[in-house]
């Protein structure tokens, strides 16, 4: 007899676009089209399901951790819509209000793929900052409301992973 209350559930998700796979829209309900490109939306659905079903913590790695622009403190009129950051923040807020332990561990790239000083990477880092700011603000508000003596970084922990970046290397 296994005690499932003490078991772990680990899922691995990998996103794909029509650049990396031959996608047939007639065979999948999770394909969306954005700017003329097909992408598989099932990863977002899977993340949301895992976030909502998690009990004590969630661990995720993402090269591009940004989204939920509709909840940002500063409205930048950006189409950075996916809901995963807001889902994580909401889960943490719910756990704070119920007095339960919960931590989100998010590992992000020090620099997204591309030239670190380039406009696109700098814009992505800015959006990532707005995303983290929104999450920490919501968590801090829940901590204040409940009188919980913790700090938001004790509930949502961002860790930076250094990824090697090479520009036009020649042997």
Residue spans for each PLM region:
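Charged, low-complexity intrinsically disordered terminal segments
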Residues: 1-171
């Amino acid at each position: 007899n296994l005690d499932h209350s003490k078991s772990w559930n680990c899922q691995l998700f990998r996103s794909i676009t029509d650049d990396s796979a031959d996608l047939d829209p007639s065979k999948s309900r999770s394909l969306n089209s954005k700017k003329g490109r097909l992408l598989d939306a099932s990863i977002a659905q899977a993340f949301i399901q895992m976030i909502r079903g998690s009990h004590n913590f969630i661990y995720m790695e993402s090269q591009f951790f940004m989204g939920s622009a509709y909840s940002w403190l500063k409205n930048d009129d950006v189409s950075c819509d996916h809901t995963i950051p807001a889902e994580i923040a909401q889960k943490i807020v719910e756990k704070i209000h119920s007095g339960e332990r919960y931590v989100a561990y998010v590992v992000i790239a020090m620099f997204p793929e591309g030239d670190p000083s380039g406009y696109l990477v700098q814009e992505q880092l800015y959006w990532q900052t707005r995303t983290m700011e929104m999450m920490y603000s919501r968590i801090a508000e829940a901590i204040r409301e409940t009188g919980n003596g913790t700090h938001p970084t004790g509930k949502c922990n961002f860790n930076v992973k250094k990824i090697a970046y090479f520009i036009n290397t020649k042997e």
